[in-house]
Amino acid sequence: MVSLEEIPLIAIVRIRGRVNVKPEIRRTLEMLHLNRKFWATLVPLTDSYKGMIHRVKDYSTYGEIDGPTLLALLRERGELKMGGSLSDEWLSSNTDFSSIEELAEALLSKRVYLHKLGWIKPYFRLHPPKGGFKRPTKRAWNDGGELGYRGKEINTLIRRMI
């Protein structure tokens, strides 16, 4: 049995659009809160999510997110469900977290999950990457494209999209 600390936190970024997507893939993307192109989400790499990620690998890219990238993502692109952006002041007055750093640490240690927090949107709306994609967006990462598993390289892509 694998402990919760050993399960990595995975960032998934949708790269391809909504046209001509098979219904089962579209539904899986909706369950992952990836309804539009360039939206990102964070999930733990459990068996359930592994199957979902495998199903949407031809429409997204994913990898292990690190602390500084997660912190920048929450600061720049974190949105509240009632409107507005995520801030230290709002967190300290309305939640158990005193800062965005504390929230990022809780997400990385899997004490809380992004989709289970009722006050933050479970996705991040990103820009297209600065400088464009360096590889084709219709081929897998291992074949010289942008799709699928890319490991720690997801952090450089997300930083270019924030």
Curated annotation (Swiss-Prot):
GO terms under cellular component: cytosolic large ribosomal subunit
One example of a Gene Ontology biological process annotation: translation
Matching InterPro entries: Ribo_uL30_ferredoxin-like_sf, Ribosomal_uL30, Ribosomal_uL30_arc, Ribosomal_uL30_euk_arc, Ribosomal_uL30_ferredoxin-like
Keywords: Ribonucleoprotein, Ribosomal protein
Keyword match Ribonucleoprotein: yes
UniProt xrefs under SUPFAM superfamilies: Ribosomal protein L30p/L7e
GO function terms (MF aspect): RNA binding; structural constituent of ribosome
Domain of life, per lineage: Archaea
Family: Belongs to the universal ribosomal protein uL30 family.
Complex and partners: Part of the 50S ribosomal subunit.
Descriptive protein name: Large ribosomal subunit protein uL30
Organism, as annotated: Korarchaeum cryptofilum (strain OPF8)
Gene symbol of the encoding locus: rpl30
